């Protein structure tokens, strides 16, 4: 690949990828974390033109794994893990701190070279999405996993759309299982099939150490992943250009400098959130909001900082989501600065001080749903939708504070997310009970609470403690049925007399067309809650009727 760093040979790169795979196995990292880390490393190597030495290559590989783990894992790799993996173990704490500081500088240089854009839609992520949608049997799973990782043995995967490669891998698995005689006909059909076969064949015969490492992470034998003996033409040409997955909008975001942030007057504090404080400042003669996120650990950039900047960049441009103006991480103070739209107030404060007209209520509700629908369409769940994190300026509503937001995988319930998310009055029942893995439907529950609050001016589930909120939910919605929730856990958590049917929320009686939809959004069973697109459609229709 012409664009790739000429000093990093195929064998050098493959050695790094093989090591990253073994580290991922030892630390039990997700497959998506590993694949994303390889994407980050390859993207970085596309950006640099110097020759890294062996030590720098090792540092880059493990730090790319660390960055990826901060995005994808509950328990990411820490700097102590990096020191261990690089075999740096001095008993001198002072020396360790110096080396850690140097590694933090390298990590920061990787992030800055990539403009902090480190979210990737990997081949494996798409395979998992397609798997769930097509309800495929498990016997194809391990071969698909193997092929997804085998394609990382060279950097040629960068030339192709990962979504298309994922689809082709699944088709190959199906054909080999159900009608292997059709395999040759299949791979002659399209370039992506030919590419997969060629890399598979090369890995099987030439990259044996890596091939065996991939197989060792599955339940398959080497024979079961043997490449079919099909000869393809040697004249097959891959695309010359790098395929660009459109995750981020076509917009350049300002990276502030140390000089810039040192000049800012941080006297006018607007408020504090989960992960930082927000100030009203003047930048380039314009008034904006500046969020300061401070990490308690010296030098180290925090996972929430990386997530928030990436989430904001991906969602930038939507009229009902707070816009990012720029960002900067100052390593000496361990502080991330994020420039944002300046809004007037939060929805929480606005509702206490204003009587909102019915027309404005409708506007706010629709804008909220438009924003959540867009956010979910980009594969991001907010995980902290509350009246304090919804911002108002005149008749415009915007969702803010993306410090807790993260990518989700389709509609499947995922066990590998942090449980302690969402403000307590907007927290979905599965989170309150601690009995479900969860997905983006926790946002739908929070949205149902917010719509109720906008329409009635009152919180539907008010309480200071979890037990109070659970009891309030029970009073209004009644007891969950056995299909929706584990009753023994519900009983132990609620500790209240049971009634089969709740009393409903009487202020919603003024909105007979909307409250059935809101109660669907508040279904105990997340699978029964409508998605954001359906909520938006139903609410629009209810206001028009």
Swiss-Prot record:
Keywords from the named record? ATP-binding, Kinase, Nucleotide-binding, Serine/threonine-protein kinase, Transferase
The residues listed in the UniProt record as binding ATP, with positions renumbered to this chain, are 270-278, 291
Q: Which Gene3D superfamilies does this chain map to? A: Cyclin-like, Phosphorylase Kinase, domain 1, Transferase(Phosphotransferase) domain 1
The superkingdom of the source organism is Viruses
Please state the Enzyme Commission number of this protein: 2.7.11.1
Q: Pfam families, alphabetically?
A: Cyclin_N, Pkinase
Protein name per UniProt: Putative serine/threonine-protein kinase L673
Q: Which organism is it from?
A: Acanthamoeba polyphaga mimivirus
């Amino acid at each position: 690949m012409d664009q790739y760093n000429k000093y990093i040979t195929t064998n050098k790169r493959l050695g790094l990828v093989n090591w990253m795979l073994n580290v991922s196995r030892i630390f039990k990292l997700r497959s998506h974390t590993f694949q994303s880390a390889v994407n980050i490393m390859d993207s970085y190597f596309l950006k640099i033109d110097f020759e890294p030495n062996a030590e720098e290559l090792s540092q880059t590989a493990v730090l790319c794994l660390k960055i990826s783990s901060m995005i994808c894992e509950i328990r990411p790799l820490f700097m102590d893990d990096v020191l261990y993996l690089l075999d740096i173990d001095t008993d001198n704490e002072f020396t360790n701190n110096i080396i850690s500081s140097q590694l933090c500088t390298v990590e920061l240089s990787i992030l800055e070279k990539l403009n902090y854009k480190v979210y990737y839609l990997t081949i494996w992520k798409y395979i998992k999405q397609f798997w769930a949608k097509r309800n495929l049997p498990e016997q194809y799973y391990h071969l698909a996993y193997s092929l997804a990782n085998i394609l990382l043995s060279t950097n040629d995967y960068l030339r192709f759309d990962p979504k298309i490669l994922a689809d082709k891998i699944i088709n190959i698995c199906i054909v080999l299982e159900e009608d292997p005689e059709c395999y040759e006909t299949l791979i002659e059909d399209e370039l992506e099939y030919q590419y997969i076969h060629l890399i598979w064949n090369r890995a099987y015969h030439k990259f044996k150490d890596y091939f065996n490492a991939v197989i060792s992470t599955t339940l398959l034998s080497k024979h079961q992943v043997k490449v079919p003996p099909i000869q393809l033409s040697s004249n097959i040409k891959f695309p010359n250009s790098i395929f660009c997955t459109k995750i981020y909008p076509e917009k350049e975001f300002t990276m502030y400098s140390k000089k810039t942030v040192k000049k800012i007057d941080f006297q006018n504090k607007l408020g504090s959130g989960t992960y930082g404080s927000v100030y009203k400042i003047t930048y380039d003669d314009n008034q904006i909001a500046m969020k300061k996120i401070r990490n308690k650990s010296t030098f180290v950039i925090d996972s929430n900082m990386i997530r928030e900047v990436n989430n904001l960049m991906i969602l930038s441009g939507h009229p009902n989501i707070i816009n990012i103006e720029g960002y900067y991480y100052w390593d000496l103070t361990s502080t991330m600065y994020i420039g944002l739209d300046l809004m007037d107030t939060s929805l929480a404060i606005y509702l206490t001080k204003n009587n909102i007209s019915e027309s404005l209520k409708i506007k706010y509700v629709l804008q909220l749903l438009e924003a959540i629908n867009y956010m979910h369409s980009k594969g991001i769940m907010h995980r902290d939708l509350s009246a304090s994190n919804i911002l108002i300026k005149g008749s415009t509503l915007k969702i803010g504070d993306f410090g807790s937001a993260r990518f989700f995988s389709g509609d499947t319930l995922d066990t590998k997310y942090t449980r302690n998310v969402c403000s307590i009055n907007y927290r979905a029942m599965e989170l309150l009970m601690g009995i479900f893995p969860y997905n983006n439907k926790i946002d739908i529950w929070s949205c149902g609470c917010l719509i109720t609050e906008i329409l009635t001016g009152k919180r539907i589930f008010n309480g200071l403690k979890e037990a109070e909120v659970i009891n309030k939910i029970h009073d209004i919605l009644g007891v969950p049925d056995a299909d929706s929730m584990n009753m023994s856990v519900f009983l132990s958590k609620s500790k209240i007399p049971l009634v089969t049917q709740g009393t409903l929320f009487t202020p919603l009686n003024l909105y007979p067309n909307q409250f059935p939809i809101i109660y669907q959004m508040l279904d105990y069973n997340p699978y029964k809650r409508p998605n954001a697109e359906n909520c938006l459609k139903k609410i629009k229709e209810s206001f028009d009727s």
